[in-house]
Amino acid sequence: MTHSPLGRCLFISGSDTSAGKTVVTAALALTSGQVGVMKLVQAGAGDREYYQKILALDQSPTELNPLYFTAPLAPPLAAQREGRTVDLAQAWQSLTQLRQRFPRVLIEGAGGLGSPVTWEWTAADVCAQWRLPTLVVIPVRLGAIGQAVAQVALARQVGVPLRGLVLNELAPLTPEQRQDWAPVGLIQQLTGVPIVAQFPYVADIHAPECLKQAALSADMAWCWSG
């Protein structure tokens, strides 16, 4: 079933599990005013606990993370191990509740757009079917160009409403490294998708003020445009 567009939402995906989606999402949340945050599905500890420490969230644990499984595996496999299924209707209900309470909602995915959410759907399918404007976080390292092209190709094939790409520095980089590994002009030329932010390296990802400064320097407000 295809749902109506959700103009107040942003889905944050990435090229893989270590792209830095959680940090980028937290930084965007800290600079977006009144905002709800949802980790769509989590397998193993990590992201939801980070959000609870960094963000002053006025929402229930179920709204923050409607689908949680213990084993750090792909969600359908983690659910199978517990004798459960991934119930996306439950996630949709949590998202609807957040939309009713907040003018903006950030939804973080698990892994990349090609990562499985259920036995039938990938993250890209969720974004396409729920019509979620999507940002894809690409870590600035060797291989970034190919990762960006691959993620955009999958998004287009499935029908994901792409908002743009975010280049994320996971370590201190020189200007030469940035240009060599993730040249903005070439990536935009190959993908036809704008790079809406270049997120700088954050030395202390557990310091909200550092995250705020990084988001402001990257002009992350543009991520909501479109």
Stretches found by the model and what they are:
Residues 184-218:
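C-terminal binding/interaction regions
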Residues 43, 110-198:
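Conserved catalytic-core segment of NTP-binding enzymes
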Residues 91, 95-119:
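Switch II (G3) loop of P-loop NTPases
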Residues 3-7, 23-85, 89, 94-97:
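N-terminal phosphate/diphosphate-binding loop that engages ATP/GTP or pyrophosphate donors
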Residues 11-25:
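Glycine-rich phosphate-binding P-loop
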Residues 36-39, 62-65, 105-109, 136, ...:
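General beta-strand structural signal in soluble alpha/beta enzymes
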Residues 31-36, 100-103, 131-132, 191-193:
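Short glycine/proline-enriched coil/turn segments at helix->beta-strand junctions
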Residues 1-10, 209-226:
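Short, low-complexity, intrinsically disordered N-terminal peptides in bacterial proteins
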